């Protein structure tokens, strides 16, 4: 619920606290939602969830988030930038639960229903966030960052209590299988799906390049809190509209086509931000952005949970997340370099070109037939 305004206002808040665009880019690469720490923690969380249960990892992620927002609120309340660095690290650690949540969903949901259920959950997550993001934009001048961050901590505490009361491990997830802890064992498993991993790694890097520091860049173009609030409202509308192709039609038109459509929409939106960054077009960009998300994420979830073996599902989902996050580190760093060298539009233009290039990888490595479980075949790449 609160991530709707955190996601949109976090970077502008940091600008107001005195952080530069370059510093924000480095922080996002190292310890942000898509940074190095975030990626490394996910493979650890996924692997341990296979052998020790999903529940405790999910609760740990929520606890880290509560600490994150309390630390960030203290940083803004007392004007202590050093605490922002700690908040970034805690935020990265909180994401250890992401692949665990996906693995738990796959444990309980049958294959034909996974993409539809996942799309429904996307809507349930985005719509409340859009409302809070919109009102935060409208009243951002009277509600300071510490107040909104404390609200986030409070809402996450409620979420933790609900998780503690309701979430239970399924028998298969609590088996005593001892997963090998060597990196070589994980690498051997990943090598069977090199092309599959490559598609999602390329997508992650391209989107990080095009949008990784977007909100910080928009802050330099005189966009207001009201503008950011409008973006927070319209992006989830795109998610709602895109739920139909993203979830309900995965098995009818194929995940492959949905992934390509998502990339084309995303690249078009990124080019729009690059060359037409005007407030009048914010609703259009927000809806297209949300539609791209809702077309991509359920298809990725469906493909991942089908292709990865059940006994190592948490580990492989974590490995995929880690691969995606580690390659994403490059995006904000390149974006900062392009911004400093060539100006505002360069990062988004380069990101759009990379997104278009990923369509070729999708055509090469994602199979057409989605009528049943994907079959592994020897990789020639």
Report residues per predicted region.
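Helix-to-loop junctions at the C-terminal end of transmembrane segments
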Residues: 40-53, 140, 242-254, 339
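Helix-loop boundary and gating motifs at the non-cytosolic
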Residues: 1-39, 192-231
């Amino acid at each position: 619920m609160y991530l709707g305004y955190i996601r949109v206002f976090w970077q502008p808040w940091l600008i107001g606290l005195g952080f530069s665009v370059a510093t924000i880019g480095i922080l996002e690469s190292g310890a942000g939602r898509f940074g190095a720490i975030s990626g490394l923690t996910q493979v650890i969380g996924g692997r341990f969830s296979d052998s020790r249960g999903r529940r405790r990892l999910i609760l740990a992620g929520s606890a880290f988030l509560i600490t994150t927002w309390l630390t960030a609120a203290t940083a803004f309340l007392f004007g202590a930038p050093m605490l922002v660095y700690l908040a970034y690290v805690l935020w990265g650690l909180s994401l250890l639960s992401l692949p665990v949540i996906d693995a738990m969903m796959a444990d309980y949901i049958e294959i034909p229903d996974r993409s539809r259920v996942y799309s429904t959950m996307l809507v349930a997550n985005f719509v409340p966030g859009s409302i809070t993001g919109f009102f935060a934009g409208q009243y951002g001048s009277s509600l300071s960052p510490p107040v909104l961050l404390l609200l986030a901590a409070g809402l996450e505490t409620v979420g933790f209590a609900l998780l503690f009361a309701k979430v239970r491990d399924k028998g298969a997830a609590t088996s005593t299988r001892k997963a090998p802890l060597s990196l070589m064992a994980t690498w051997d498993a990943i090598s069977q799906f090199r092309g599959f991993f490559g598609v999602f790694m390329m997508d992650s890097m391209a989107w990080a390049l095009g949008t990784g520091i977007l909100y910080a860049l928009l802050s330099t173009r005189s966009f207001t809190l009201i503008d950011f609030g409008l973006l927070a409202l319209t992006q989830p509308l795109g998610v709602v509209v895109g739920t139909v192709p993203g979830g309900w039609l995965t098995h009818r038109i194929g995940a492959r086509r949905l992934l390509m459509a998502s990339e084309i929409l995303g690249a078009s939106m990124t080019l729009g931000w690059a060359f037409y960054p005007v407030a009048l077009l914010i609703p259009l960009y927000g809806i297209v952005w949300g539609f791209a998300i809702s077309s991509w994420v359920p298809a990725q979830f469906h493909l991942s949970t089908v292709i990865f073996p059940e006994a190592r599902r948490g580990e492989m989902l974590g490995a995929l997340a880690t691969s995606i996050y580690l390659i994403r580190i490059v995006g904000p760093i390149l974006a900062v370099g392009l911004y400093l060298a060539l100006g505002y539009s360069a990062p988004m233009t380069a990101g759009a070109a990379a997104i278009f290039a990923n369509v070729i990888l999708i055509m090469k490595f994602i199979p057409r037939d989605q009528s049943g479980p994907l079959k592994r075949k020897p990789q020639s790449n």
